[in-house]
Amino acid sequence: MARLLQASCLLSLLLAGFVPQSRGQEKSKMDCHGGISGTIYEYGALTIDGEEYIPFKQYAGKYVLFVNVASYUGLTGQYIELNALQEELAPFGLVILGFPCNQFGKQEPGENSEILPTLKYVRPGGGFVPNFQLFEKGDVNGEKEQKFYTFLKNSCPPTSELLGTSDRLFWEPMKVHDIRWNFEKFLVGPDGIPIMRWHHRTTVSNVKMDILSYMRRQAALGVKRK
């Protein structure tokens, strides 16, 4: 009986996913660099079913939140909070985009066709369906990283000094601006310029407060200009 209980506990830990321990100085949020050359509108990506290429210029005039996601991570529960965030802030011009990635702890191992069923029946489960667009699985770091992630990372300083445990990170070469783990977030403004970058442990509620605060400041500046 004790062995069965021990095995059950071990399985629960494995299913709960893995989030790397805190190492080095971390910041919940970083403001992106000024004077960025180019915009996110120069890029695009294929939807998760592979049927449509969406140019990001389609989102011109919107605030766009880029999130690298994974189905078997200790942070996968953020999917539910991201759904709520999308619903709440869509009237204010926010669009969330999700990019599955298997480079952190191998926590997105399935094919593209398996990701949505996993979210629906396994994690978060309970019939969950994301209300924001997911794109094809791809790399966010390393030699084969998607070019728009190169742009985002070069536009914003990292939120942590250290990358983490190397045996849980699957890319080369490693660079100082690389994404540290699943569910790191970048906010891009209505002009296509990156604004903020959040650490993966920053709660979605804090991300929401930061976004709303920025929107209010921009609205106030607009009123002053008039």
UniProtKB/Swiss-Prot annotation:
**One cellular-component annotation, GO:** extracellular space
Main location, first listed in the record: secreted
PROSITE patterns linked to this entry: GLUTATHIONE_PEROXID_1, GLUTATHIONE_PEROXID_2, GLUTATHIONE_PEROXID_3
Q: Tissue-wise, where is it found? A: Secreted in plasma.
Q: Which GO terms describe its biological process?
A: hydrogen peroxide catabolic process; response to oxidative stress
Q: Which GO terms describe its molecular function?
A: glutathione peroxidase activity; identical protein binding; selenium binding
Q: What residue stretch is flagged as signal peptide?
A: 1-24
CDD domains from the entry?
GSH_Peroxidase (cd00340)
Please state the Enzyme Commission number of this protein. Answer: 1.11.1.9
> Could you give the subunit structure recorded for this chain?
Homotetramer.
What the protein does comes down to: Protects cells and enzymes from oxidative damage, by catalyzing the reduction of hydrogen peroxide, lipid peroxides and organic hydroperoxide, by glutathione.
The record's section on PANTHER family has: GLUTATHIONE PEROXIDASE, GLUTATHIONE PEROXIDASE 3
**Family indicated by similarity:** Belongs to the glutathione peroxidase family.
What's the protein called, per UniProt?
A: Glutathione peroxidase 3
Native organism: Pongo pygmaeus (Bornean orangutan)
Q: Gene behind this chain?
A: GPX3
